[in-house]
Amino acid sequence: TAEQLKLFRDIVNGAGGQTQNRGAYAVLTANIDLKNEEWTPIGPDRDSAYTGTFDGQGHTVKNLSVTVNVQPGRAGLFGCVKDGTIRKLTVAGSVSCTANQGWCGGIAGYAMDETIENCASLCTVSCTGIDARVGGIVGLVDYNSRTLIIRDCYNIGKITGRSDNGSGDAGGICGFYMNGKISNCYNVGEITGSGYVSKIAVSAYNDSRPTNCYYLSDTDTDLNGTAKTAAEFANGDVLEELKAGQRDNNADPWADECKYLAAAGKTLPVFN
């Protein structure tokens, strides 16, 4: 229930009279409706980053509403995650930050050495302060992160990164990262930013570019992904590529057929 998820958050954050446990283990057993009530992120800052395993079991947290206006802002269902795993989770709602150094993502604002897999964001995500980093799944990956993995994820929400100093980086999956592995993902959401913009992820180094990732466009203009038309998404071409990109250590999460997603207004690959 929503109340149980709030209790879990308070345990991780050490709030509401709870003894802090940043590594608490959680499993969703049903979809959760947060009813657009203002949500304080799980792991609101790097000192309180969530370090455990969160298994969504294919469920959705919907009507998420996050508004952060305190610098530095870390906004998402999770604010900061580190050295843990988030899997099989879909989030829907809105995430925004107006503070400087705002990092925003549907799943998490900030990540370091984390594994995020089989996750989807249907969120509208925006950051408007100086040095904004905003992504569909994760806003910013720590510069010192070495073992981050984002795989088999997708975004269909609108992503906006706007900053007065021109540094509003925005990516469909990740707003900015230097090290780590992003693979087997797709984005069909609209991406805009005043800094660097990528349909998949803004990356600093060529050797850390995303692999086997796809975005919706009639023109192939993004080096960090491969453009596919709406027809190629709908007819199973992208799904076939995603299934072909599976590794032995990661069970295939993708359904055998595409499905019409009302939130996107398109037929797209979905999870089992």
What residue spans do the PLM features occupy?
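Surface-exposed repetitive/solenoidal architectures
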Residues: 1-272
